[in-house]
Curated annotation (Swiss-Prot):
InterPro entries, sorted: HisE, PRib-ATP_PPHydrolase-like
Pathway(s) per entry: Amino-acid biosynthesis; L-histidine biosynthesis; L-histidine from 5-phospho-alpha-D-ribose 1-diphosphate: step 2/9
Protein name: Phosphoribosyl-ATP pyrophosphatase
Top-rank EC class of the record's enzyme: hydrolase
GO cellular component, one term: cytoplasm
Upper taxonomic lineage: Bacteria, Bacillati, Actinomycetota, Actinomycetes, Mycobacteriales
Family listed: Belongs to the PRA-PH family.
Compartments, record wording: Cytoplasm
Gene3D superfamilies for the chain: MazG-like
Amino acid sequence: MEEYYFVKNFESLFEELSQKIAERPEGSGTVEAFDKGIHHLGKKIIEEAGEVWIAAEYQSDEELAEEMSQLLYWLQVMAHKRGLKLEDIYSYL
């Protein structure tokens, strides 16, 4: 019997974050970071961008992919904080 695993993509993560921010589950790190504001989120993005660079220079592809996923996560939280939709971002790709 084949097993299927749900793989998140950019759109599903954005929707998951939308739901989490709207529902505000107790103990959510996402909600806590969201509430701390733009400055806090900006620092997280800078931190993750640095970790992506270091991983690209010195670590495995798996570690690089993990760091890149974390950067994308924080970029999406920032987008939500500013009220951006995916269409706003996609219009510049």
